[in-house]
Design a protein with these regions (language model features):
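A hydrophobic alpha-helical transmembrane-helix feature that marks the membrane cores
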Residues: 1-175
Length: 175
């Protein structure tokens, strides 16, 4: 259930440090697979909840997945075809993530639904920026380690999907 999903997400968080520590070795590949498996497994209970709670849960999941794919392909395609360097976004994105983490922690205690939606909207924009930034770094040679490149893009896509799911569910979900 939800407890197992939370443990898997926590395990994925721990594995993200293992991935960084092993990124320069062949063990890093195994660490990436374990990390992705834990994060995906942790996502399972959330997806199940959407299917059970909302009568249109399958449509919400499909929309979130489709929009995630569209955003990723559009932004990565733009960075690939133009070759533009988006390194200038780095400081803004890092600061934005720190602000969002503080806001998320605050909302755990405050439990304000509108704040949750605002956070999701901001995280969607931030993850879009990270996709541009990370793809640009890969294309322009700023990120030469394919393991770290994989993790960076995976986390951007994962978080983009989660927050699109939250936003679409709140706006179109029917009980």
């Amino acid at each position: 259930g939800q407890g197992a999903g939370l443990l898997m997400i926590i395990g994925g968080f721990v594995m993200s440090f293992v991935v960084r520590a092993t990124a320069e070795s062949s063990k890093g590949i195994l660490a990436v697979f374990v990390f992705a498996g834990l994060m995906g497994g942790g996502l399972g209970p959330t997806l199940s909840a959407y299917l059970m709670i909302y009568s249109n849960g399958a449509a919400i999941l499909a929309q979130a997945l489709g929009v995630t794919g569209l955003i990723f392909l559009s932004l990565s395609g733009y960075a690939l075809t133009t070759g533009k360097n988006f390194n200038f976004l780095g400081g803004f994105l890092a600061t934005g993530m720190m602000v969002m983490l503080v806001a998320m922690i605050a909302n755990i205690f405050l439990q304000i639904p509108a704040m949750s939606l605002a956070i999701s909207g901001a995280v969607i924009m931030l993850m879009s920026g990270f996709i541009l930034y990370d793809t640009s770094r890969i294309v322009n040679g700023g990120e030469r380690n394919y393991i770290m490149a994989t993790i960076s893009l995976y986390l951007s896509i994962f978080n983009l999907f989660i927050h699109l799911l939250n936003l679409i569910g709140a706006l179109t979900g029917r009980d």
